[in-house]
């Protein structure tokens, strides 16, 4: 099981990428077009993200302009934004949607921080599940006499040290995101 480090690194890079993608969709003090990544509309019979059917620009710090490529879906996009958990109120002039983004209240910031912590914890659980799977594979090899008991202990220690490093990295990413959310 010499390739356990490569296996662990591959799995953990996917966990960290997933964490990063989830955090991109959280609203922070600065508005980003990524907050619209998880807003979908029905388009040609399929659930489609609004980011794939429109251009999203942020000309000012608190203004978002969404221009659908097909004007017939303007109302669908507007409704999807209203029905989302972003607490935004879009207005349409018939060709583009403008959203004046209000500053986040401290209560809303706390809710977003709570959600960010929940996301981090879910990713830590994924990390621990990866550790458990890897530990089981290594223990199975020891039972089948593919590796010695000393090798087993060394490998399990290495796995635990690597997992600890990845958990610290998740905590660091969380702290950075919390600072970004709380920034006024």
Curated annotation (Swiss-Prot):
* First-listed, main subcellular location of the protein, grouped into a coarse class: cytoplasm
- GO annotations of cellular component type: cytoplasm
**Does this UniProt record's set of keywords contain Cytoplasm?**
yes
**What does the record list as GO biological process?**
translational termination
The cross-references to SUPFAM superfamilies, in alphabetical order and at most eight, read: Ribosome recycling factor, RRF
Q: Where is it localised?
A: Cytoplasm
Q: What is the protein name stated in its UniProt record?
A: Ribosome-recycling factor
């Amino acid at each position: 099981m010499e390739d356990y480090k490569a296996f662990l690194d591959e799995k953990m890079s996917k966990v960290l990428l997933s964490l990063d993608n989830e955090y991109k969709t959280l609203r922070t003090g600065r508005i980003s077009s990524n907050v619209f990544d998880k807003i979908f509309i029905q388009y040609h019979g399929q659930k489609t993200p609004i980011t794939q059917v429109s251009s999203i620009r942020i000309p000012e710090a608190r203004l978002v302009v969404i221009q659908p490529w097909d004007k017939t879906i303007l109302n669908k996009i507007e409704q999807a934004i209203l029905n989302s958990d972003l607490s935004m109120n879009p207005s349409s002039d018939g060709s583009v949607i403008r959203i004046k983004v209000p500053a986040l209240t401290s209560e809303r910031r706390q809710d977003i921080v709570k959600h960010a912590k929940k996301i981090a914890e879910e990713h830590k659980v994924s990390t621990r599940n990866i550790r458990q799977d890897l530990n089981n594979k290594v223990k199975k090899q020891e039972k089948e006499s593919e590796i010695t008991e000393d090798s087993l202990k060394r490998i399990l220690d290495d796995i635990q040290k690597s997992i600890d490093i990845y958990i610290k990295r998740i905590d660091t990413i969380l702290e950075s995101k919390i600072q970004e959310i709380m920034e006024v």
